[in-house]
């Protein structure tokens, strides 16, 4: 018999909205934390201290565990590794080179290194999605929702985008603090252009969430500029590029030179302004 989830009160619904804005989690996962911890501060602390949300339905958990077991690495049975990830992608019809939904899964399912998945966060992450997903066909059917969320939800975009940086630099234990430029360009090209053309856009212009003013032409200038600089990409430049893209106007006039922007972005603004003066 299917379990019946009690509806959230108006107060709890507001707390769920606040929790999602802070953490970038799904509605289902946010609701689990709010129901368990009752107060926003306690729920957020638990989330960032990696305390688990309430367990999934036992039957769902068992089935998801069986999915994980199917792909785990025979030489390291505590992990799904690259070979298993490629098999998983094949079953889910994901092209890992061109489909950013794999990064959605990585962020939501707690992947700490590229192509690696521990069992507990893998199971809990899928269980946090709506619809009682307990099979690969159900997970595959949910992927279009994640793809749409990535290009339309600013908080989710930032969560997945920043997690991609951590993966690409080698995970949380890596001593590498920046990304090779070629890697960064590949990832920017994967994340930014699809969001430019979606309405609503994850890169909507602030403060009014109007259509983006930083679009493909400005993005192309950014790539051109970075290729000329030919430098590795720092975490600050990576993360703040999203805020910059959402705040800058089409003519690059409304830029706060005194703001706490990375020097790379300062230099880019001057680069674009010089180009515009020369037109």
Swiss-Prot record:
GO terms for biological process: protein neddylation. Keywords: Ubl conjugation pathway. The keyword Transcription does not apply. Residues 12-48 form the UBA-like domain. One of its GO terms (cellular component) is ubiquitin ligase complex. Residues 59-273 form the DCUN1 domain. InterPro entries: DCN-prot, DCN1-like_PONY, PONY_dom. PROSITE patterns: DCUN1 (PS51229). GO terms for molecular function: cullin family protein binding; ubiquitin conjugating enzyme binding; ubiquitin-like protein binding. The keyword tRNA processing does not apply. May contribute to neddylation of cullin components of SCF-type E3 ubiquitin ligase complexes. Neddylation of cullins play an essential role in the regulation of SCF-type complexes activity. This is Defective in cullin neddylation protein 1.
